[in-house]
Regions:
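Charged, terminal alpha-helix-loop-beta segments
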Residues: 1-202
Length: 202
């Protein structure tokens, strides 16, 4: 449950621990990214070319949104103590991984779009061989003939208590592309908290 997740972040857990919990319950990542509510498919360790993405979430309607996620631990500050220094090295690693995925998808867009729609159908039909979760709606109302909307998200580290405004400016400044987002685990938990506040578990 979300309390277990919050505990991991408060304990400044390392990446492996956080990854393990999310892989055991992919709804954490899916709830963070799904729009509309409950309409998603989430994969872990998803192959993109010869690389592997930590998580991929498929969501939206008509034009499918493909969210490609790399995560790091909660055992460092997302932005360095001197905010002129930019992001922590672990976040830069995540961004490099995402840029590799971005380059592959941009070069092989058509085949990737075909692959992701095929894997979406396999997951819905319970035929996908990897670790995945299909949302409670059990389907995605997306059109395989339309382009896909690919977003890249790096999640890692925790916020410094006194630097939220400078930190948000720093994160925006460090974004290498409009479709690449950077988030701390604090912002991840805030969004999940808000989500579960609006959609309490029945």
């Amino acid at each position: 449950n979300i309390e277990d997740f919050i505990e991991l972040i408060e304990e400044n857990s390392q990446e492996m621990k956080i990854q393990k919990l999310i892989k055991e319950d992919l709804s954490f990542m899916a709830d963070y990214l799904a729009e509309p509510y409950e309409e998603y498919i989430c994969f872990s360790n998803y192959p993109i070319g010869d690389k592997i993405a930590d998580f991929v979430v498929l969501t939206s309607r008509s034009k499918m949104k493909v969210c490609i996620v790399e995560v790091k631990g909660a055992d460092f500050k997302t932005v360095k103590a001197n905010h002129y220094q930019g992001l922590n090295v672990h976040m830069n690693d995540a961004i490099t991984q995402l840029k590799n995925h971005m380059e592959y998808i941009n070069r092989n867009y058509s085949s990737f779009r075909t692959q992701i729609h095929e894997d979406k159908d396999k997951a819905i039909n319970e035929e996908y061989s990897g670790n995945y979760l299909v949302g409670p709606r059990k389907n995605l109302l997306v059109d395989p003939q339309k382009d896909i909307d690919v977003k890249y998200i790096a999640i890692g580290g925790v916020e410094r208590e006194d630097k939220s405004i400078e930190e948000s400016h720093e994160i925006v400044k460090c974004k290498p592309a409009d479709n690449l987002e950077i988030a701390s685990w604090n912002s991840f938990v805030r969004k999940l908290d808000e989500y579960h506040g609006h959609h309490p578990v029945q």
